[in-house]
C-alpha cells in the first residue's frame, strides 16, 4: 500500500466503499424483510 504518495486519497476511497456497502446492505435487508412480510 502506497499511503505516502496520496494520504488524502485513501480515507476518501474508504468512505466511498463504506457508503456503497451500507447502501447495498440496506437494500438487501429491505428486500429480505419485504419478502418475509409478503410471504
UniProtKB/Swiss-Prot annotation:
It is found in: Cellular thylakoid membrane. Keywords: Membrane, Photosynthesis, Photosystem II, Reaction center, Thylakoid, Transmembrane, Transmembrane helix. Coiled coil: none annotated. SUPFAM superfamilies: Photosystem II reaction center protein L, PsbL (SSF161017). It is a single-pass membrane protein. It comes from the Bacteria. The keyword NADP does not apply. InterPro entries: PSII_PsbL, PSII_PsbL_sf. The chain crosses the membrane at residues 18-38. One of its GO terms (biological process) is photosynthesis. One of its GO terms (cellular component) is photosystem II reaction center. NCBIfam families: PRK00753.1. PSII is composed of 1 copy each of membrane proteins PsbA, PsbB, PsbC, PsbD, PsbE, PsbF, PsbH, PsbI, PsbJ, PsbK, PsbL, PsbM, PsbT, PsbX, PsbY, Psb30/Ycf12, peripheral proteins PsbO, CyanoQ (PsbQ), PsbU, PsbV and a large number of cofactors. It forms dimeric complexes. One of the components of the core complex of photosystem II (PSII). PSII is a light-driven water:plastoquinone oxidoreductase that uses light energy to abstract electrons from H(2)O, generating O(2) and a proton gradient subsequently used for ATP formation. It consists of a core antenna complex that captures photons, and an electron transfer chain that converts photonic excitation into a charge separation. This subunit is found at the monomer-monomer interface and is required for correct PSII assembly and/or dimerization. Belongs to the PsbL family. This is Photosystem II reaction center protein L. It comes from Prochlorococcus marinus (strain MIT 9515).
Amino acid at each position: 500500500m502506497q499511503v505516502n504518495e496520496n494520504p488524502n486519497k485513501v480515507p476518501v476511497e474508504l468512505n466511498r466503499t463504506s457508503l456503497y456497502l451500507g447502501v447495498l446492505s440496506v437494500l438487501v435487508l429491505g428486500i429480505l424483510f419485504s419478502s418475509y412480510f409478503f410471504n
